[in-house]
Amino acid sequence: MFKANVLLMGGDMTSKVMVPIVREPEIGYTATFLGKQVKISEEGLPDLRKQIRQHCYLPYVCSKAEVEKLSRDQEYVEKVFEDLEVEMVKDWLSLIPKKAPGVKVIIHPGNDDKFVLDDVLKNSPDIVFAEESVVHFDDLHEAACVGWSNPTPWNSPRECTEEQLLEKLEKTVSQLKSVETSCFCFHVPPYNSTIDMAPKLDATLRPVYEGGRPAFIPVGSKSVRKVIEKYQPLLGLHGHIHESPGLVKIGKTQCINPGSEYSEGILRAYIIELEDGKAKRLQRLEG
């Protein structure tokens, strides 16, 4: 449709929600999905799994005993999540030759993506794994890719101090041939940039309301902003804060965050056309 030469995915590939589908000897299967109790037969299982995945949730077919173990064994929960995430990413990667033939697919993880996924991505012949490295869009335009974030309330796998993040950013940017014609593909957006606004949380991680409305605060990275202001790349390509889509200029650099509504089955992205060291087109896409 768009005749793209490159497809870039900048992290947060996997779901944070698992949906147990419980085997019931006399019923078939039961599950709680989208707030509703669902009962299905064996024949309906593939369709339910498909529906769950379309919302980017992780379907987990299991017994009642396994559900009970999930409720009391956090290590088991983590192991199941890892296995399901690996399975989902492998399934997605298998679609690339059919869905995007001839397209250069570049993927780097985000702060929420577990390290176990790195080997899955590195072993795929159909993508370029780009974490903490530089990749080429074409002969002129490069991308410096870093998926780590500054600290979050969620203790995610790839977060670090601002000082550590700055070191990672500088090390990666130093590999670029020409910053002026390059993109900074940093998962976390720059601090206080309007594309980093997230709900303010209290000590129990519940949203704070002010004047009867949820309060929002900037949660992006000061190190990312510092590096963008220092080097002024062509584009800043960001994500991380799903509820804060937009486009903003920091100096000469246009920074974008497409946002995300994956749980609603909505794709958000940007169509970017690069030519002669300039961004000729930045078109938001959702559907």
Task: Show which residues each predicted segment covers.
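Divalent metal-coordination and catalytic microenvironments
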Residues: L7, D12, G110, A143, ...
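Active-site-proximal segments of metal-dependent phosphoesterases and phosphodiesterases across multiple
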Residues: L70-V86, C183-Q232
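Binuclear metal-dependent hydrolase catalytic cores centered on His/Asp/Glu-rich metal-binding motifs
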Residues: D139-C183, D202, P214-K222
